Amino acid sequence: RAAPIARRTAQAARAAADEFDAEGWYELGLELEAVEPGEARDAYRRALELDAHHADAHVNLGRLLHEQGLVEEAERHYRLALREDPDHATAAFNLGIALEDLDQPADAIEAYRAALATDPRLADAHYNVARLYERIGKKAAALRHLSIYRRLVG
């Protein structure tokens, strides 16, 4: 039911795209994500052509690329977002996931820790870092983060 509304909104926005600034392209990307992820990626790329410093466009483009299996490219966009906004918890969290997918657990732990330094209530970051600590044999750290995770979700 929402998809046709989102499509109509996106079609109307595309018709006015010549007038868009970076934020307009970013907003169009948000509208398109649910119905046309490929077009959403294009909209985020256009936003970044107009404003290479748009951290949220980097994060969202990175997430869509990651979902497409382009993990290295996603990692690059998450890092660019963090360069623009070092306290972007979502960028740091998503970077952690990408680094896990690239089998870089130590770097993933650092990314999750950066996300938690910005937002200690990110339950999923606590869970993911607990799993990684368990994997590398740091049982006490794993238990500490698992306990925090349970407190946050329980």
Language-model-derived ranges and their functions:
Residues 1-23:
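Long, contiguous interaction/recruitment modules in multidomain scaffold/adaptor proteins
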Residues 20-31, 35:
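Mixed-charge (acidic/basic) macromolecular-recognition segments
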